[in-house]
Amino acid sequence: MIGKQRLWQTSVVGLLLASFSLFSVLYMEQIERRMLEWFMVLRPGTMISSLWQSPAMDINVDLYIFNWTNSEKFSDPTVKPRFEELGPYRFTERMQKVNVEWHDENSTVSYRRRSRFDFDPKLSAGRPSDPIVAPNLLIVGLYQKMVMWSPMLRSLMLLALNIYGKEQAMIRPASDWMFDGFDTPMIKMSKMVPPSLVPEMKFPYEKIGYAYPRNGSMEIYGHHNVYTGRDEFRKLGQIARWRYNNVTEASPRCKLKGSAGEFHPIPLVKGRPISYFLPDLCRELQVDYSGTTIFEGIEAYVYRGSARNMANGTDNPDNSCYCQDNCQEVRSGLLNISSCWYGAPVFASYPHFYKADPYYGEQVEGMKPDKDRHEMVIMLEPKTGMVLEIKARIMANLLVEPKTHLIYRTARRTFFPLIWADYNVRITDDLLGYVKLMPILEFVGKICGILGVVLGVLMVFWYPHQMIWQKSLMHKIEISSIETNRSLEPVKNNDVEDSPLLKGLKYIGAKDAVGNGN
């Protein structure tokens, strides 16, 4: 009874082990994906949420500023503006998310972003004190707004500009053009004008600068609201609202979309582009799939910035909704981001007009587009969507147009390069170790699953058969032993009776017994 019970128990355990192991081997990728999804969903107090709020990876930011070397000849329309590139000015960005609020009702989380930029003189070719000549960004932006004003208000403003804003070019140290910013008479004048009289004159900051006031500010990047992935995992890290709106500031008909930068819809699909929502551009920017490569022994999907990503709405309908109403449509290669610069005619492009219409590079001198230095490249691990390396390069350009009664009235329509940034991010060695460990764990899991199937099959079939065979063998041995004993027993009895020695011993024993009895 005990043997049969043991056989049944062994068979059941073996069947369960084989079934579970076979299921694990066949659905290993699905199981791994479910576990990964559970781990990556943003929840309060988890390790992934802590890394998300305070990323372990520092961002190296190289800034390059364009110095206008022949500004004194700008009034001559036959002379092209000439620029020299100064830099890099290396900064280390340490980003943190603050004022984090969780919204379980719609599976989103809100936060503000605060970044600290620390200058690194050892890795910089330029000095903060380098003198930089650039067009008068503030005046150009104000002129752009004045076109929509009434004639009387415009005349009054032109009178004020003759006093406060005659400079067509400004010279400032590089640090002022970057994060420090600087004051101007125009900003002081704008503070004296009642906002109710001329709302367009309201300037949000006390200073002006290409990157001012990004250093340490948590207001400049705006209020973010992203999906946690709890209800729908593919939405993890995707932008839901920015500055409390779900549409862009450039056009209310254009919905916000794209990753906030940390997460991507996984698993990544070959041939499908990825998109980011960039607060510096106030819009989405797509990056096209380029192929695969090996990064530190890991397979990586490569995405590159293409001409299509920077095309206008005519060449790329995906970009059409970002330029509507009063937005200026330009040739492909530049994106209108005026709404992000408080109405100033600022456009984004790849550095040195890389992959842009040749028209832009022919307007100015000093542009040297280079694939290795100016291409945007992103490498991601396909199963987790984890960032392995980013080289994000973007340039800001100012459109200067001839206007009647203005200091630029003799100028030809030109896009002035102002500054470009090279954002470099690389995965840390610790995180890279975890990523490398994943395929090893997957391989070990499959091996263990196969061994589990083999062991389970042995427990179901081989072990019971072996037990039955051994029991049958023992039974045969017992029967054979009994038969052997029976065949040997008569032979032994006959030998004893015929033995003379044994007969003599019996006789002596019987005689002694009679003597003792007397």
Give names to the regions the model predicted.
Residues 2-299, 306-512:
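Extracellular or lumenal secretory-pathway regions
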Residues 514-518:
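A positional/structural detector of protein chain ends, strongest at the extreme C-terminus
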